[in-house]
Amino acid sequence: LKYSSPVNIVLLHKNLRISDNSALYHGCNADKSLIIYAYDKDYWSNNGKSERQFQFCLDSLGELDEKLNKLNRDLFIFEGDLDELALWIDKNFPQSKIFLNQSTDIHYHRNLKAKFISKFEDSGRLYEFEDFGIQTKNHNRDDWSSNWHRIMTQKILPPPQINHSSKIKPKDLLDFKAFKKKLSLVDPKNNSFQLGGEDKAKKLLSSFLGKRMDGYSIKMSSPVEAEHSCSRLSPHISFGTISLRTIFQEVQKNMDSSIFKKDLYSFKKRLHWHCHFIQKLETEPELEFKSMHPMCDSLREEGNDELIEKWIAGETGFPFLDACMVFLKEKGWINFRMRAMIMSFASYNLWQPWQKTSPRLAELFVDYEPGIHICQVQMQSGVTGINLPRIYSVSVSYTHLRAHETDRH
């Protein structure tokens, strides 16, 4: 069925929330609006993407669908890539306007999105909103920080005000509930992974700013204490179940009255760094495959699949490294310092090319954020040409390890 009247189409990707969502807020401000998430099967099997990340995405979409239902809207799933979606929109909604938030992702998605944006931008039908303060055009390092701060201090948008009763139900799209039923997913055996959803993100932020952040600036480096002392918001930030602006403003609000000022300041700095690294990948997308310093690509050219498999499985024979890998596989998360150690071990001790180990490690992270992961992989592999190489000692004795074991490790 072809809709000749104007329709606003909101395209979701890494902004799976109802509050402070510019694309959703402005896109739903019309008599007729359609909210779509594009499920591209190939995307979820591409460079570093994995089933555990998709499960978090599904959790988040499910909660968002429930919130939209209360506003008399449904979340629809388009099955296909962005090229196919563009053709579908042109065929069925030739007068539509498209609303989406800016996001930086892996090469596979970036190329498809660039073509999608170009197609609709040229006709003045596309509206893309800033989310992380990433400059997509005319990148200027001199005003980057001031621009980031401007975005983080803007007014937080409420949920969209949808007062219209008219609903669009395209026959060739599945609503979220039907899509999830079609997937026939078996409940994951591992219930140790974090669950997605905006409500869970807000609860984590509240508990972190309340008591959990006590000692954060020190405890975040500990493989024992970090699990409970870190914010644990990383997957929620990556999938956009809470806006970075919301987090930033809550931190600012607590700054004067909190007794954890040092910890708050340390956390606030990391919000800035988060976007700094994503900007790096946005500006230099080739970093996904090539070393920052071109001469370093010839350092480690041949990979040893057997070594890489033992590393991923936590079967290297180095107790501390193996314990960290088993923990990561079980939880889908480990603290930043241990991530650095794991990657450094693969690049220095095993002398494996980061291009082979990077996606394998990324698959284990529920919170995989390409911009951060890829930049950190290169830093820990010593291929940036500007960062001091760090080699971590993993020769921890069994006696020392046993003293700090969790119940499982």
What kind of feature is each model-predicted range?
Residues 41-97, 102, 107-111:
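N-terminal Rossmann-like or analogous alpha/beta NTP/dinucleotide-binding catalytic cores
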Residues 229-401:
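Active-site-proximal binding-pocket segments
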Residues 400-409:
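Single conserved hydrophobic/aromatic residue that forms the stacking wall/gate
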